[in-house]
Amino acid sequence: MTHADTDIRPLTADQQEFAALTGTHWIRASSPSDAVTVTGAPGTWYADGGAVIGTGLPDNPQGQVRLAPGDRIVDGGRVFAGHARAGVAALRTFDRDSEGARSVTGVEVFWQDDAWVVDAEFTADPQTVTVISADGVEGPGEVVGWLSFSVPGDAPGESHHLQVTDQDGDFFVSFGDAGAQAGTHPFRFLNVPAADQDGHTTIDFNAARLPALAFSDAYLCPLPSAVNVLDVAVPVGEKRVVRK
């Protein structure tokens, strides 16, 4: 069911892949002698030097494959990829024919509203914070400061604040908003251009996008910190995943 201010958009290629993730499997075996089987993957697996090693793989001339984080191999409609977090290696399994992948049919997206392209001021405040991933694991994260801004409906002088990280010279933010009470995904991601020399930038909330976790709960996305949950609804950007 959609609302008058939203449309249904087909999945992008990236979102199709997000939906196909069936598992993030942490590999703690460290030698061929204690290699483990992984649900949805052939052969047996162990970790070595930050990579995962698969052995006894069918249709592989060497019978073995090494997948460092970001490496992947394709096996028909399935994909196997290396991953790591805090020095622990994992094997990610993707299957576009999985029930989860087939259940995702599109993304509900709010209509564009240029009123939600807002001016913002950046205040540098670099610090190390605790980041909580979707599976509850905590780890350190580096933030670079705050963006301060007003949104449509604010009273004169009212403002909001988001803590941001650096991403390739621009800003990245994981944020939640009060719209979650009306069906918007509990949190979304947003990229913001770097501030100019006077600290000015522009936030386009229309570009708010769903995290990979919205498509498959096998992802381990960073949750927004309490300070990044806005007390107003943000009725623009991607709203939620549509399923059968």
Regions found by a protein language model. Name each.
Residues 100-102, 127-129, 182-184, 211-214, ...:
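Short helix/loop capping segments that flank catalytic or ligand/cofactor-binding pockets
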Residues 42-47, 77-84, 159-164:
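Broad, structure-driven detector of short, well-ordered beta-strand segments within folded domains
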Residues 78-148:
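Surface-exposed beta-loop interaction hotspot
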Residues 26-73:
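Forkhead-associated
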Residues 193-244:
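Long, compositionally biased interface segments
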Residues 148-196, 206:
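Acidic/His-leaning functional-site neighborhoods
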Residues 13, 28-29, 40, 106, ...:
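C-terminal, non-catalytic interaction/recognition modules in large multi-subunit enzymes and RNPs
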Residues 1-41:
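N-terminal cleavable signal peptides for secretion/export
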